[in-house]
C-alpha cells in the first residue's frame, strides 16, 4: 500500500490515517479528511464511534439459520414469523440482504453463502455455506429458491452449481432478471434495477 504518512504530522495521526486507508473505498485523501475530522469532533462522538466499532467484534455473530449478521442467536429476519416461509433468497454476503430489503419487494427468508465459488482463489463449494442451505431444504417447507448471487463469473458459477443441486429436489429455482449488468455487485445496484430484477426473476 502506498505510504500516506505526512512528515509534518504527529505519529498518532499518521497511524490513524493509515488505518482508515485500509478500509474499502477509502483512498489516501479520504483517510486524511476523516482523520482530521475525528480530531476536531467532540470527544463523546469519537468515543461512541470507538465503542460501536469494538461492539461489532464483541457482540455481532452469525444467525444460526441463515448466517446473516446477528446480535443474538437469530437475525431479525429469521425472528420474523410473518415472512413467507416457502421462499429462500440466496445471496453472497450480508450486505446484499440490506440492498434487497431496502427495495421492499421480497418477503421471504434469506441464506448467506459468505462467498462464491472461485477456483482461481481456491474457494470451493466446501468453503461457503452450501451444505447448510441444502439442510434447510430438507423439511419440505420451501418451494422456491431465488439465486441472487452477483452477476459475475463467480456468482454465475455458484448459481449454476446450486441449480444442479436443488432442481432434483423438485424445488423451483429462479434467478434474478438480467436487469443487473454483468460484473455488478448486488449491494451497489440502484433500487429500481433491484426491484425489477426481483419481480422479473426467471426459472433457472
UniProtKB/Swiss-Prot annotation:
Signal sequence, start to end: none
**Keyword Zinc-finger: yes or no?**
yes
User: What are the entry keywords?
Assistant: DNA damage, DNA recombination, DNA repair, Metal-binding, Zinc, Zinc-finger
Molecular function terms in GO for this entry?
Answer: DNA binding; zinc ion binding
ZnF (C4-type) residues: 63-78
The Swiss-Prot or TrEMBL record describes its family as follows:
Belongs to the RecR family.
Q: What is this protein called?
A: Recombination protein RecR
Amino acid at each position: 500500500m502506498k505510504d500516506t504518512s505526512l512528515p509534518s504530522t504527529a505519529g498518532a495521526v499518521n497511524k490513524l490515517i493509515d488505518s482508515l486507508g485500509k478500509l474499502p473505498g477509502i483512498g489516501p485523501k479520504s483517510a486524511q479528511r476523516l482523520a482530521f475530522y475525528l480530531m476536531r469532533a467532540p470527544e463523546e462522538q469519537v468515543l461512541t464511534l470507538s465503542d460501536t466499532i469494538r461492539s461489532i467484534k464483541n457482540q455481532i455473530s452469525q444467525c444460526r439459520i441463515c448466517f446473516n449478521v446477528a446480535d443474538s442467536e437469530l437475525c431479525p429476519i429469521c425472528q420474523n414469523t410473518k415472512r413467507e416461509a416457502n421462499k429462500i433468497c440466496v445471496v453472497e454476503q450480508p450486505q446484499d440482504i440490506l440492498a434487497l430489503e431496502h427495495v421492499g419487494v421480497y418477503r421471504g427468508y434469506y441464506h448467506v453463502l459468505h462467498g462464491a465459488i472461485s477456483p482461481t482463489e481456491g474457494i470451493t463449494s466446501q468453503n461457503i455455506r452450501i451444505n447448510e442451505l441444502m439442510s434447510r431444504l430438507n423439511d419440505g417447507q420451501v418451494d422456491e429458491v431465488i439465486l441472487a448471487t452477483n452477476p459475475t463469473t463467480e456468482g454465475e458459477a455458484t448459481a449454476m452449481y446450486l441449480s444442479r443441486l436443488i432442481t432434483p429436489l423438485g424445488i423451483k429455482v429462479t434467478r434474478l432478471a438480467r436487469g443487473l449488468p454483468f460484473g455488478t455487485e448486488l449491494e451497489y445496484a440502484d433500487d429500481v434495477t433491484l426491484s425489477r430484477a426481483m419481480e422479473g426473476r426467471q426459472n433457472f
